[in-house]
Amino acid sequence: MAMVVGAWRDPQDDVPGAQGTQPAPAPPVQGPPAGTPHTPQTPGPGGPPSTPAQSNAASQQSQGDKQQQQQHIECVVCGDKSSGKHYGQFTCEGCKSFFKRSVRRNLSYTCRANRNCPIDQHHRNQCQYCRLKKCLKVGMRREAVQRGRMPPTQPTHGQFALTNGDPLNCHSYLSGYISLLLRAEPYPTSRFGSQCMQPNNIMGIENICELAARMLFSAVEWARNIPFFPDLQITDQVALLRLTWSELFVLNAAQCSMPLHVAPLLAAAGLHASPMSADRVVAFMDHIRIFQEQVEKLKALHVDSAEYSCLKAIVLFTSDACGLSDVAHVESLQEKSQCALEEYVRSQYPNQPTRFGKLLLRLPSLRTVSSSVIEQLFFVRLVGKTPIETLIRDMLLSGSSFNWPYMSIQ
């Protein structure tokens, strides 16, 4: 098939009668001689010139030859009969329409096999992922589609999906992606209450636990509404959130300036009511200190809401989760989120060339905050011994993040 592409890159170059070639006149049948019979292109002085009818006949014959030859051109994607050159390559109408629709809508496809499905006339509709992959591989050009008139509609969540795992590296596209991340945030500052934004305010035990529950719910609800995540298999969604919920919790705590005073935290964990050895108390307080340090380091960078959204997306889309059905796809989503953050920081903070690196360097240390400590500090009073991972799974499977059985979240 590749040989066909090379042979028909410009069909006019190989067709008789193309531009620059004068059709030979028909040899005279009657009348005086019109020059030597071996050189009909240069008739003698007495020879009659070509008539319009003869030229028209030659042109029609040439056009017919071109049409006949073009009918034998195969679609470089599926091998069906080509209808012409579309977006840089000869394709059939079906592959042309499929490619245009996929690029204009930025549709995301998933291969259920090994990303190497056969694409021919009989199988081209069985795997959209591999069909689009082949369209790009044979040289169909995205930019040729995007130069066309775009529908004047507001982009929706699905319109910012990846194609073939490759992000569209343009500023407007990444800006749109960040806008959708921000739009998915279910928790404006006011939702957590005024106490959250008052670092010097010492919150009561009940308020601390309620705030923690709100932040956990918000992390799950945000993930359910950002681009790409809802398109993943539910098992992958559960695996990603079960691994990263504690890191998202720390980012949310920093974003809302959650007060982290030691005494209320120890009381919330119930440590004041149960006897503990001195060593265990010291170890637990060390965990609290690590939590406090991570939050303070993020607050010191004055991270804005767009940066927080990108950081959370980078954390969420991690290929470290066990049992992912498509590791490469999740990696591409993380890379896309990282590119969006880099583009945003470069445009919004041009005088801080090291800002992007500083933000990324904060992420690995988030895992130093023990998830079991977060559970004991904030959730043991609400859910007892029920693992947070189980609650996250139930929230995703139920389709609602705000069905907490132990308290009412307004």
Swiss-Prot record:
Superkingdom in the source lineage: Eukaryota
Residue ranges of domain NR LBD in the record: 173-399
Cellular localisation: Nucleus
Biological process terms in GO annotation: cell differentiation; negative regulation of transcription by RNA polymerase II; nervous system development; positive regulation of DNA-templated transcription
Biased composition (Low complexity): 52-68
A Pfam family it matches: Hormone_recep
Record's compositionally biased regions (Pro residues): 24-51
Residues covered by region (Disordered): 1-68
Gene Ontology MF annotations: nuclear receptor activity; retinoic acid binding; RNA polymerase II cis-regulatory region sequence-specific DNA binding; sequence-specific DNA binding; zinc ion binding
Zinc finger regions, NR C4-type: 75-95, 111-135
UniProt subunit comment: Binds DNA as a homodimer.
Descriptive protein name: COUP transcription factor 2
Source organism of this protein record: Gallus gallus
